[in-house]
Swiss-Prot record:
UniProt-annotated stretches for the region M-domain: 304-541
One example GO MF annotation: GTPase activity
Protein name (database record): Signal recognition particle subunit SRP54
Gene: SRP54
Record's comment describing the protein's domains: The NG domain, also named G domain, is a special guanosine triphosphatase (GTPase) domain, which binds GTP and forms a guanosine 5'-triphosphate (GTP)-dependent complex with a homologous NG domain in the SRP receptor subunit SRP101. The two NG domains undergo cooperative rearrangements upon their assembly, which culminate in the reciprocal activation of the GTPase activity of one another. SRP receptor compaction upon binding with cargo-loaded SRP and GTPase rearrangement drive SRP-mediated cotranslational protein translocation into the ER.
InterPro entries on file: AAA+_ATPase (IPR003593), P-loop_NTPase (IPR027417), Signal_recog_part_SRP54_M_sf (IPR036891), Signal_recog_particl_SRP54_hlx (IPR013822), Signal_recog_particle_SRP54_M (IPR004125), SRP/SRP_N (IPR036225), SRP54 (IPR022941), SRP54_euk (IPR006325)
Coiled-coil region list: none
Entry's Gene Ontology BP terms: SRP-dependent cotranslational protein targeting to membrane; SRP-dependent cotranslational protein targeting to membrane, signal sequence recognition; SRP-dependent cotranslational protein targeting to membrane, translocation
Length: 541
């Protein structure tokens, strides 16, 4: 996502200010604001909106700093982060959007009409929204009322078939209002919950287009009218949305092509200024690449803080409820099997492009930028191959039998076309996830250590009690080169694999040869700078 560059620049400006607050606070704030303002203007955010944001941040920070004469560095850091975060959220927030939000109801006919210019991604967005609601238990139908563009019905038909969504259209009828009415009557008789109507678009805002939209709207009486806007037009989105608003009085907006343009931030802020809520953003070409828009979630992902709420929502839509229940029961018993690990990997791979998932996980977006999506995807597939080569008994275990019987690793490596070292690394990752899952369970309200936090992990703005993740101020960063060097050290010291797994898994007992682990060798390895950095990342340094 090109918007990630904007996030990096804002983060850089904030982090520089945080590290220099011990000098002159006012100067540090002004330097930070210069960096933020430049980044926003280059992303095509309206200059008046940027000026307002700058003034708000500056006045709040200087006022708070004067009133709190004995603030610590940690308090100053939190103040800067929270103020910048809150003001960026305001920049993309439509006032009263929550009160205006349309919520479709099951067992009732909900008609949604789409409008917009040709080429904005309107027809594709219709299918994406149909898939979104279908996943949530609604019975959804698509109607093509675009009789102007050649191939419009074919496009919607192909998309609908691929997404397994019922559709209606006509190759002969030229009256769009009549086609829309016929389609709605058909789906009403069949008790559909949601009927989505796609309308014609034009290359320009022609009077005929607006008149056609009014005629269709008068006939079908939609519960919600959605305008689809191309995010690549930047702040010009404001003028376009106002022109449509005067004619069709739409109630919400979907912004498309947010994955490929730096001007998306400008489009969002411009639309928010028109006081029309953005309900979804398109983040790719796949039919699942539609995200519910929330100002806090958007800014969190932009700044690399992550969006755990959206991640959980996506996990729920693709995960098997019985599998999830079984995994949770295992975790509560203090057990996380290789089969649980495999199911988690398969669920993640169903969620669409890894770059979209990485934005929701704190610190992961930067890692994806360093390693690359294709390489990461290939590694995940290889992990599944390794797990597929294990027996039922092995998958239902917690991995100890591989340590007790190393020949099992050799067999799995041969069966999956990988190396013994790669099998070892997957076992180590499973142990790390087991420890994290058990820790999360222990820290639920009422459990011992419920308020415990990992050492060195700061809270992030707008996300109370949410521990920060890698790449934040004060945290060391593990680079791909460091990981490769650490892996080389493990290859050169194969006996240390047991020790690493003991360290991550809470002590699994029994060595490769049945003896005590060689702690002297372990200590030597952990004194290496690369390994120390890795240890700190996992809260062990």
């Amino acid at each position: 996502m090109v918007l990630a560059d904007l996030g990096k620049r804002i983060n850089s400006a904030v982090n520089n200010a945080i590290s220099n607050t011990q000098d002159d606070f006012t100067t540090s704030v002004d330097v930070m604001l210069k960096g933020i303002v430049t980044a926003l203007l280059e992303s095509d955010v309206n200059i008046a909106l940027v000026s307002k944001l700058r003034n708000n941040i500056r006045s709040q920070l200087l006022s708070e700093n004067r009133s709190e004469k004995s603030t610590t560095n940690a308090q100053t850091k939190k103040l800067i982060q929270k103020t910048v975060f809150d003001e960026l959220c305001k920049l993309v927030t439509c006032e009263g959007s929550e009160e205006k939000a349309f919520v479709p109801k099951k067992r009732k006919t909900n008609i949604i009409m789409f409008v917009g210019l040709q080429g904005s991604g309107k027809t594709t967005s219709c299918t994406k929204l149909a898939v979104y609601y279908s996943k949530r238990g609604f019975k959804v139908g698509l109607v093509c009322a675009d009789t102007f563009r050649a191939g419009a019905f074919d496009q919607l038909k192909q998309n609908a078939i691929r997404a397994r969504i019922p559709f209606y259209g006509s190759y002969t009828e030229t009256d769009p209002a009549k086609v829309a009415e016929e389609g709605i009557n058909k789906f009403k008789k069949e008790k559909f919950d949601i009927i989505i109507v796609d309308t014609s678009g034009r290359h320009h805002q022609e009077e005929e287009l607006f008149q056609e939209m009014i005629e269709i709207s008068n006939v079908i009486k939609p519960n919600q009218t959605i305008m689809v806007l191309d995010a690549s037009i930047g702040q010009a989105a404001e003028q376009q949305s106002k022109a449509f608003k005067e004619s069709s009085d739409f109630g919400a907006i979907i912004l498309t092509k947010m994955d490929g343009h730096a001007r998306g931030g400008g489009a969002i802020s411009a639309v928010a200024a028109t006081n029309t809520p953005i309900i979804f953003i398109g983040t790719g070409e796949h039919i699942h690449d539609l995200e519910k828009f929330s100002p806090k979630s958007f800014i969190s992902k932009l700044l690399g803080i992550g969006d755990i709420e959206s991640l959980f929502e996506q996990l729920q839509t693709v995960s098997n409820k019985e599998d999830a229940k079984a995994t949770m029961e295992n975790i509560q018993k203090g057990k996380f099997t290789l089969l649980d690990f495999k199911k988690q990997m398969q669920t993640i791979m169903k969620m669409g492009p890894l770059s979209n998932i990485a934005q929701m996980i704190p610190g992961m977006s930067n890692m994806m930028n360093q390693v690359g999506e294709e390489e990461t995807s290939q590694k995940m597939k290889k992990m599944v191959y390794v797990l597929d080569s294990m027996t039922k008994e092995e998958l239902e275990s917690d991995g100890r039998m591989f340590i007790e019987e190393p020949t099992r690793m050799v067999r799995v490596a041969k069966g999956s076309g990988t190396s013994v070292f790669e099998v070892e690394m997957i076992l180590m990752q499973q142990q790390m996830m087991a420890r994290m899952a058990q820790t999360a369970t222990q820290q639920q309200p009422g459990a011992p250590g419920a308020n415990a936090r990992m050492p060195g992990m700061p809270n992030m703005p707008g996300m109370p009690n949410m521990p920060g993740m890698p790449n934040m101020p004060g945290m060391p960063k593990v680079t791909p080169q460091m990981m490769q060097q650490a892996q080389q050290k493990l290859k050169q010291n194969p006996g240390l694999m047991q020790n690493m797994m003991n360290m991550f898994g809470g002590g699994m007992g029994g060595g490769m040869g049945g003896g005590m682990p060689d702690m002297n060798e372990m200590m030597k390895m952990m004194q290496d700078p690369q390994m120390q950095q890795m240890a700190k990342q996992f809260g062990m340094g």
